[in-house]
Amino acid sequence: MEPLTPRPIQARDLQSWLQDDRPDPLLVDVREDAELDLARFPADVLHWPLSRSDAWLESVPQQLADGRPVVVICHAGVRSLHLGLWLLQQMPELEVWNLEGGIDAWSLHVDSSVPRY
């Protein structure tokens, strides 16, 4: 059996999803506080910095209980992929997406007002 992996989503496709009639996904940003100070995603997100997983780990099942698809975001798409893999190991029924290229791709392809760092 193949291991579960998050589905890749490009920045422009995520933008379309957030603007169309489909229910919005739950956005989870795994970047650190200092990174959020540099560049914020222009939508509501859950902030789960990986370095402080002890602060949010226990609440994950509650926060994901509504069954919405989850899109995980980081700077370049690597840390978010790792969290996405972990989420699918814990809750294989979830629909998990990874923003390819992270917020950097969002800045390059969707919204240049989001600073690059």
Language-model features, listed with the residues they occupy:
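Short, surface-exposed ligand- or partner-binding patches at beta-edge/loop junctions that are enriched
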Residues: I73
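Rhodanese-like catalytic fold shared by cysteine-dependent sulfurtransferases
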Residues: M1-P25, D33-P69, V78-Y117
